[in-house]
A protein has these predicted regions:
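Conserved ABC transporter NBD signature motif
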Residues: 65-75, 83
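Helix-to-loop junction immediately C-terminal to a conserved catalytic motif
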Residues: 57
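The feature captures the beta-strand-to-loop junction immediately N-terminal to the Walker
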Residues: 42-44
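Catalytic Walker B motif of ABC-type/P-loop ATPase nucleotide-binding domains
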Residues: 166-169
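Conserved ABC ATPase signature
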Residues: 141-145, 149
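Conserved ABC ATPase "signature" region
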Residues: 119-137
Length: 279
């Protein structure tokens, strides 16, 4: 598969006062995202993960280096709307993404702004709302919905544009456990349907569902690999002030005590399977 996103020696620095010492939020990051993949990017607050996310579709532009989306440079003003149509983004707070008084109008907002035919917009809105199981709410006012329902509407608004990639910037951070579960099921469904998913999160149980995990620390990539590889590096992860998933921590403890636990035991489901099969 080809890369949909390519990051080359990316540095990003927020504007600072005259007396402040320059401190890049992103420092020399190189990363390639394969089309159709599911990548989780995790890190503590201040690690640079959300800043990186906003550089992926031109919401922020590199201070140095470059970001390419399907070969298009995010610094190219003439390509920026093509880039954002290809790489959509869902934010942590859905209230910041909802713009209309009626759900179906909100979902239609993106397609309308890229000049889609009205008949096609209607089909896309219905399809996107069905994809997030919110079809029966299309005539409701978004402000009357729960946080999880609002986030589903925000996702539907991005899906209606039909991007090849969706960047989720901590989409479950403001939700209760049930809401988190529902949103993760939608994200996994979109990935199965062929959309490239980039998930920014600080929840380890979400990160283990990805094909690939990237750990950010102090603006740099600390670890990059499969969940099995990354979450076996428990000391390095803890040095970045992150927790290892509980299942992975139990697996590490069992290995240290002489039990041959497979390296792919990083989720509760996989740990349960191993325990049931162990003799």
């Amino acid at each position: 598969m080809e890369n949909i996103i390519k990051i080359e020696n990316l540095y990003f620095q927020y504007p600072q006062g005259e007396d402040e010492e320059p401190k890049p939020a992103i420092k020399g990051v190189n990363l390639e995202i394969e089309e159709g993949s599911f990548t989780a990017i995790i890190g503590q607050n201040g690690s640079g993960k959300s800043t990186l996310a906003k550089n992926l579709n031109g919401l922020l532009l590199p201070s140095r280096g470059a970001v390419y989306v399907s070969g298009m440079d995010t610094r190219d003003d003439e390509k920026i709307w093509d880039i954002r149509q290809m790489a959509g983004m869902v934010f942590q707070n859905p209230d910041n993404q909802l713009v209309s008084a009626i759900v179906e109008d909100d979902v239609a907002f993106g397609p309308e702004n890229i000049g889609i035919d009205p008949v096609e917009i209607r089909a896309r809105v219905d399809e996107a709302l069905d994809a997030v199981k919110m079809g029966k709410y299309k005539r409701k006012a978004p402000h009357l919905l729960s946080g999880g329902q609002k986030q589903r509407i925000a996702i539907a608004g991005v899906v209606a544009i039909r991007p090849r990639c969706i960047i989720f910037d901590e989409p479950t951070a403001m939700l209760d456990p049930r809401g988190r579960k529902d949103i993760m099921e939608i994200i996994e469904k979109l990935h199965r349907e062929g959309i490239t998913v980039i998930l920014i999160t600080h929840f380890m149980d979400e990160a283990v569902r990805a094909d690939r995990v990237v750990i950010m620390n102090k603006g740099e990539i600390l670890l990059d690999g499969t969940p099995e590889h990354v979450f076996s590096q428990d000391e390095l992860i803890k040095s970045a002030r992150l927790d290892v998933p509980m299942a992975a921590e139990i697996a590490i403890y069992l290995r240290e005590n002489g039990i041959d636990v497979p390296q792919d035991v990083v989720t509760a489901e996989r740990l349960k399977e191993f325990v049931c099969q162990y003799r």
